[in-house]
Each structure stands twice: as C-alpha cells, then as structure tokens.
Amino acid sequence: YGNEGYLIRSIGGAGTIISGGTVKNSVLFENVFVDGAKIEESIIMDNVYVGKGSEFRKVISDKDIRIHPGVRLGYDPELDKRYLESMCRWYPKRMPNELMQISPEGIITIPKEVEIKRI
C-alpha cells in the first residue's frame, strides 16, 4: 500500500494493514484496515475499515464496520453524542442502544455491521 504506518505498544491480527496511520495502546483483530487514521486505547474487532483522517480514542468496536474519512470519536463528549444522534437517523429501525453507546468514562462501543459517516 506504500504508506508507512505505526503500531506502538499494540497488537495487530492477521491481515491487518496500517497504511499511513498510527495505532497506539490498542488491539486490532484480523483484517482491520487503518487508512491514514489514528487509533488510541481501543479494541477493534475483525473486518473494520477506518478511513483517512479519522481519530479514535477509547473505542471498542464489533466486527464488519466501516468508518468513513474524518470521523472523530472519543475526544469530545458533545461530538460523540452528535454522532450517536446521527446514527439514529441513519438506522431508524434500530434502537439507540443497538447503535453506539457512550459510558460515563467516555468509552464508546460500536455494534457490528454499521457505517459511521462524518458529520
């Protein structure tokens, strides 16, 4: 893929590619593609794509997720809430607690098979 990526104090599963991004203090399962994004203190399950310029901190994601470029989660509680509200509009048949959850400590969980678009 050509762009140098960094895996710092982290574990990357088989098939994981970090292209031009940085992953720090995190665990990435199989077939995670980090495309010029920053991930910190997170657990990312199988088959997740994280788009360019996205930033994650304290995120636990399930599998089969697509994160569009420029999504920022875990840095600003108000912005995190806006993403949750947006997801409710994108997936009207799902209950809010089936989409994204935010703990009082700021840990964000994302369920399987969703896309998160930049707002």
Model-derived segments and spans:
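Left-handed beta-helix
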Residues: 1-119
